[in-house]
């Protein structure tokens, strides 16, 4: 059953020594009142680990979108994690289905 607003994410990544770009996309229909947290990572100079450059939490209540930023989240939610796009998609999908 589809409820809530449609959320679509598409990302594309092409590195110097790859011929085919890596693309990943996901579509979610969040349930009313469900929290969605999105962290964006950027790798510079092929660093061994990446840190989040932004965090956004969104919640839909009665069709109205409310947002908070990472400064409103607790310290436990700020731990940097390195995930591939596929791992991120799987983790978000898993949390949305809880």
Curated annotation (Swiss-Prot):
Cited function: Pathogenicity determinant. May act as a suppressor of RNA-mediated gene silencing, also known as post-transcriptional gene silencing (PTGS), a mechanism of plant viral defense that limits the accumulation of viral RNAs.
Family: Belongs to the geminiviridae protein AC4/C4 family.
A Pfam family reported for this protein in Swiss-Prot or TrEMBL: Gemini_C4
Record flagged with keyword RNA-binding: no
Feature: compositional bias, Low complexity: 79-90
Native organism: Tomato yellow leaf curl Sardinia virus (TYLCSV)
Any GO BP annotation: symbiont-mediated suppression of host innate immune response
Identification of the protein by name: Protein C4
UniProt entry keywords in alphabetical sequence: Host-virus interaction, Inhibition of host innate immune response by virus, Suppressor of RNA silencing, Viral immunoevasion
Disulfide bonds: none
Region: Disordered, residue numbers: 69-98
Domain of life of the source: Viruses
């Amino acid at each position: 059953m589809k409820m809530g607003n449609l959320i679509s994410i598409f990302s594309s990544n092409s590195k110097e020594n790859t011929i085919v770009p890596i693309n990943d996309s996901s579509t979610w229909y969040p349930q009313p009142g469900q929290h969605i947290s999105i962290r964006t990572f950027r790798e510079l100079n092929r660093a061994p680990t990446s840190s989040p450059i932004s965090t956004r939490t969104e919640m839909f209540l009665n069709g109205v979108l409310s947002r908070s930023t990472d400064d409103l989240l607790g310290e436990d939610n700020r731990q940097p994690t390195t995930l591939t796009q596929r791992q991120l998609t799987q983790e978000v999908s898993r949390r949305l289905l809880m």
